[in-house]
Structure formats: structure tokens, C-alpha cells
Amino acid sequence: MEQGKLYLVPTPIGNLKDITLRALEVLENVDLIAAEDTRQSLKLLNHFNIKKPLFSYHQHNEQGKSLDIIKRIKEGQNIAIITDAGTPGISDPGSVVVSKCIEENVAFEVLPGATAIT
């Protein structure tokens, strides 16, 4: 079975229209979306009519959920991580699962977009 991939997808800081076309394409095509705050993320996903299974992934469950994410990717699923605003892993959850991807030789991709730095 072919492995899936993890995508770190930046989300707009403020205006929902600031999301990239590539980010929308990835969100429309992944199997699952891990979200820092599912309520906040649903605003974005509903705005763009993206209907994908969503689960919470935040600083309080990041360690355990990261293991589940890696397992699912190894089983062939493609998973996106999004935060409330900006790029996952920069002042937001994401760095733990990326470290585990490196340790486990699991493919991941960081999309360009808004960050807490900009």
C-alpha cells in the first residue's frame, strides 16, 4: 500500500479571501483535516464549501494525535493540518507531527501562505 502525505496548510489571517488556490485544492482533495479549533475552521471550510471529515488537533492533544496522524498516513490517507490563522507549526500546533514524520520517514509538504511572522 502506498503511503499518504501530510500537508501543512496555511489559513488566512483575517480575510477568508486571502487563502491560496493551492491551499483550497489540497483541502478539497485530502481524506481528513486536522484543525486547531474545529469551530473556527468550519467557518473557513463552509465558506469554500469544503466537506471533509474534521478532527481536533491542538496543543493539549498534539502528542497523542500526532501518532494517529502518522499511522493513518502510513495506511495511505492524505491529511491536512490547519490552524485558526496562519501556518501550522509557527506559534501553532504542527511541529510535533512534522518531527514524527521526519523520524518515521513519512512524506509531508508545507504550503506557502500567511504566517504569524508576516
Where are these predicted regions, by residue range?
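Glycine-rich, flexible N-terminal cofactor/catalytic loop recognition
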Residues: 1-60
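Conserved strand-to-helix beginnings and helix N-cap segments that scaffold or border functional pockets
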Residues: 20-21, 66-67, 91-95
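Short glycine-cluster motifs
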Residues: 74-118
